[in-house]
Amino acid sequence: MAAGKEIRTQISSIKNTQKITSAMEMVAASKMKKAQDRMLASRPYCEKISNVIGHLAYAHSEFEYSYMNSSEKLQRIGVIIISSDRGLCGGLNTNLFRHILKQVVEYQAKSIEVDICTIGKKATSFFKNLGLNVKSVLTDLGDTPHFDDLLGTIKVMLDEFDADEIQQLSVAYNKFENIITQTPTIMQLVPMVAGESNNINHYWDYIYEPDAQEVLSALLVRYIEALVYQGLIENIACEQSSRMIAMKSATDNASDMVKELKLIYNKARQAAITQEISEIVSGAAAV
């Protein structure tokens, strides 16, 4: 029963792996719930600051802001790409990278260059290996990143926009739809796209300190930072939900493999017993 011993060893190994994937599934489920809570808590902030900016921009249309004015000609754009630091989360990163590369190819076909800022080890290694122009890298943020951790990286790209080195800046991440569905998303940050606020015909106004222009300038930067942070925590929620599903699938597959191997083992054992009985019967008949 040398083959039977090998099968038993294989079953034992698969069961040990199954314990690991099952534990990882439970950990991912717990982290996903926390990430969802952070994601839902931050959404109202982005919505409110967007409304305030829309109000200010409409009420004070005499002010000129580069973040709100489109360039006549695109020569170079910037993309902040958000990915996970770790793997074992299904095709989450692969689907996002494929979506980004499709856009990059379209831009390059129009002779538009692309500068990239990567957040997460997976995006960093992938796009560096492709030879694209990576301007800034940020990794090891963990499962509970702080808002301030992103400010330096975002500033690198905004400084490029202010210097007219890039004429458009976007953020790419996985948008959390539900536990099953995560959508690769590329959202334009600047120049800002006009929203519904511009359709309102009547505005009351705020009292500003020190003045409306300075307040709006500060809010525009903070809004961009908030959108990138929102993208980051949504991507973390997507990562944990994808990992939970991937680990559940791995655990289920391990169970199926164990069942199949047990069936093979039992058949081999039955054949060995049958052979032994046949040999005993043959020996007895010979006597």
UniProtKB/Swiss-Prot annotation:
GO terms for cellular component: plasma membrane; proton-transporting ATP synthase complex. It is found in: Cell inner membrane. It is a peripheral membrane protein. The keyword Transport applies. Its main location: membrane. Pfam families: ATP-synt. Coiled coil: none annotated. GO terms for molecular function: ATP binding; proton-transporting ATP synthase activity, rotational mechanism. Keywords: ATP synthesis, Cell inner membrane, Cell membrane, CF(1), Hydrogen ion transport, Ion transport, Membrane, Transport. One of its GO terms (biological process) is proton motive force-driven plasma membrane ATP synthesis. F-type ATPases have 2 components, CF(1) - the catalytic core - and CF(0) - the membrane proton channel. CF(1) has five subunits: alpha(3), beta(3), gamma(1), delta(1), epsilon(1). CF(0) has three main subunits: a, b and c. Belongs to the ATPase gamma chain family. Produces ATP from ADP in the presence of a proton gradient across the membrane. The gamma chain is believed to be important in regulating ATPase activity and the flow of protons through the CF(0) complex. HAMAP family: ATP_synth_gamma_bact. NCBIfam families: ATPsyn_F1gamma, PRK05621.1-1. This is ATP synthase gamma chain. It comes from Ruthia magnifica subsp. Calyptogena magnifica. The lineage of its organism: Bacteria, Pseudomonadati, Pseudomonadota, Gammaproteobacteria, Candidatus Pseudothioglobaceae. The gene is atpG.
